[in-house]
């Protein structure tokens, strides 16, 4: 009898969910086309979790630039064209201003206390005001600019030192795991009742808890280091954590250590996208020797024998900027933009209900043969003399998003990428390590929200200047 009761208790919620799902299917308005799914799990079995963007891209070739999926009980649409991205982010920007509340992002952002991942538009708007006031102000930007320049020079010098310490390796593995957690849709995000059990059974709950614990220890140590009374206080060398701690002391809002940790997490993720972009840029240049020769010639001609590249040189480095843009088109750091509709709207004649998860496939848009000539080739020249930028107005090229939720740190991130790449190309000559050929370089990527190279780039560098 006890066993029978357990079976009934387990099966009853599943049966009720099946009836609810069937009712929704019969009463829904005209949705975009999409692959047929199975009861309860929908299309979950058809997705390749190791590379969602390519999986979505493949489905778009069969079902069109907008198609529907059902991830368990989570209604989902995928947009894969510049035209429909513009319709979503410009015509219906307010309706697409939220983000899906996923388990990984919720846990690792301390219940959405940071700016980037919060699904709540009003909270995001208030946090953005503070970010612009305290981080993007002219004085702060100039302070951070000096620190960034010093760090870039230090990074280049460390190429010739032994930095393969256990501590560095440990931090790298922790934050690589964070990217995997942030980019994952957990079972409990899609399947009420049984999803949490499945996450426990498959070990994803344990991985998320362990990663959160590892990250929290890192953030806590950073905060304690900044609170140490013996730490030198130099106003010109204040960093982001100093600014956040100062604001927590003087502000009358609810700034807490957890909110500071959430901001640290998001900024580490932002720095990670910069590192990823640099790695892909160098990969592309090594695979395309003529482009490498051309960009190094430009940088060294403009900078001459000054000894370093600074931000004042960047406006004259047109081909270098084209290399960065082409890299972001070819391998966008974030392959898709997650959104959630705040209310019902119509896209391309299809009805999109409120609370629908939306993935805008940046990778597919950047490889669209109807927009780009030879989209599968790395051709920086396509951006030379072009007015296309990444500020969210050219919807065929939106590596940092568009609309209200465009990446707030874009004005900081791009100069860092360009400055770092320019100095790497100016100061160093690059070759393949002994025993390796250029053909050994691949474009394989790890699963996760950010497109990390599966096989880290290994190059030999010799000092040019």
Model-derived features: positions:
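Conserved cytochrome P450 K-helix E-x-x-R motif and the immediately C-terminal K′/meander segment
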Residues: 44-57, 61-64, 217, 310-350, ...
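Cytochrome P450 heme-thiolate "Cys pocket" and heme-binding signature region
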Residues: 386-417, 444-447
